[in-house]
């Protein structure tokens, strides 16, 4: 019963706090966002520098995880998929999202992306602007399946 209120509450909290953040007038990552920057991601599933702040860890009561991910300019994930899908809430900056076989989408603050289950995709920052997203990932059907790195050619397309 309580679990069905967690996701809507997180979405409302994220958008209320993001909407109240003052503009600085430049395209660089803004400071003062509600969630901490997090720890540098040190695994090989990313190109460039990215940071993760876990907000909600999946457990026996709730099968979703929620994380705030900050990508420095040019940083991106590998191609990957999620057995139960994923939702991305864009908090700041300019980023990219691409599903295999589809054109790359440009993401900006306030955009929401629904990543379908088992569809290979990648996401990350634009070449010259940092990017911040909240990733909401279903874990009930398994963990993220990591694939190949996004090539520089794929990234530039």
Regions found by a protein language model. Name each.
Residues 68-72, 82-97, 136-138:
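Short, conserved beta-strand element in jelly-roll/cupin
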Residues 20-63, 144-157:
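A short, N-terminal "cap"/entry segment at the start of jelly-roll beta-barrel domains
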Residues 53-64, 73-79, 83-85:
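Active-site region of the double-stranded beta-helix
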Residues 16-18:
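C-terminal motif of bacterial Sec signal peptides marking the signal peptidase cleavage site
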Residues 79, 97-98, 120-126:
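Short beta-strand His + acidic residue motifs that chelate non-heme Fe in jelly-roll/DSBH
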Residues 101-118:
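Short acidic-glycine-tyrosine-enriched beta hairpin
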Residues 1-7:
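Bacterial N-terminal signal peptides that target proteins for export
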Residues 128-148:
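A short hydrophobic beta-strand segment most commonly corresponding to one strand
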């Amino acid at each position: 019963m309580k679990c069905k209120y967690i996701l809507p509450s997180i979405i409302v909290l994220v958008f209320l706090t993001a909407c109240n953040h003052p503009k600085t007038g430049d395209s660089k990552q803004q400071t003062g966002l509600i969630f901490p920057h997090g720890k540098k991601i040190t695994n090989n599933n990313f190109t460039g520098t990215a940071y993760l702040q876990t907000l909600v860890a999946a457990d026996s009561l709730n099968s979703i995880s929620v994380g705030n991910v900050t990508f420095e300019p040019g940083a991106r994930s590998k191609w990957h998929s999620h057995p139960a899908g994923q939702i991305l809430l864009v908090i700041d900056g300019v980023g990219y999202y691409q599903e295999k076989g589809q054109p790359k989408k440009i993401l900006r603050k306030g955009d929401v992306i629904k990543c379908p289950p088992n569809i290979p995709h990648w996401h990350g920052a634009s070449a010259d602007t940092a990017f911040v997203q909240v990733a909401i990932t279903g874990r009930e059907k398994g963990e993220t399946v990591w694939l190949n790195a996004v090539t520089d050619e794929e990234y530039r397309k």
